[in-house]
Amino acid sequence: MISLEIVSPSLNILENIIWLELNSPAGNIVIQPGHTPMFISVLDGDSFVYCLENGKQKNIKIEDGFLSFDNDQACLIGQKIELI
């Protein structure tokens, strides 16, 4: 299980998730429990998909941010984050 924290000036969400999928300058990345630690810049307008414990998938769009992942803890921080 991954603990995902989503933070922006107007939003703060904490979710337990199974996986997280994102597009990065290096290509598409799927993060699952035990993934190698990483720190990724997020391009404006990038979207993320993540899967909750119950199998429901959620989509978010981010502007000007980054993703940090280490020890099954993910933190997504952005100037503007929108649930879509």
Language model features with spans:
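Compact, glycine-rich, soluble single-domain proteins
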Residues: 2-84
